[in-house]
Amino acid sequence: RATFNEDISGWDVSNVTNMSHMFNRASSFNQSIGDWNVSSVMSMGYMFRDATSFNSPIGNWNTSSVTNMSLMFEGATSFNQALNDWNISSVSMLNYMFSETTSFNQDIGDWNTSSATLLNYMFKNALSFNQDISDWNIAANASVTGMFDDTPSLSNLNKGQIHKTFSSITNWPNEWSIFVTYEPITDANFQDAVNLWFSDEANATFTYGHIRDWNTSAVTDMSNAFDSRSNFNEDISGWDVSSVENMSMMFKEASSFNKDIGNWDVSSVLSMY
């Protein structure tokens, strides 16, 4: 197996359902198989494990039936091909998928990971990987132990973005909150941020942080901010409103609001009608 490197590009694999271990330790294999019809394949676990020479494009594969990609590229040290178009919406097992895949650094941020439950050690020792996967939809009970162990190329910016999404996972092991950054709140976006909070709280939190933690020190106009927001009752007592000049109708018809904001510095406010 280690010396196998024959041309098998013409194989009809349309009926194959299991390709697990297919090129496991085929260290010489690097043939073009990108045109294979893999639409029936359900398991690709260990498929290219330790296939150290393999670096052929397979980004056009139809992977919609695949449920298992565990250890798929583990130790495939040469592999660095685009995979972002793969449909992995049925995949539950991604554990060790890119472990020891030392060259891999492709954008996979658009993957639909809603079925994934096992992601432990997925990028362990993926020494080149530096991508933002913060848009992934991961279940709170998913296993992510060691997911990013020994990923020295992962930037602090990407760590922060990933942490925003992954920190809600029960066993998320990384304390990357120090790398988290949010879009600054200014007069230009304050009302947009408030509106987004009510229409899509998760997105607002991802973009601006939780509303209670917003840095509003640059905002001068908060007029009508919570006008008619009858359900609003978040604790915004920590807001810095020292620059605000206009608070007119800020809480108009915000009938549920009942938080203590008595310590606000309103010395710059000119209008509170």
What residues fall within each predicted segment?
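Negatively charged
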Residues: 1-273
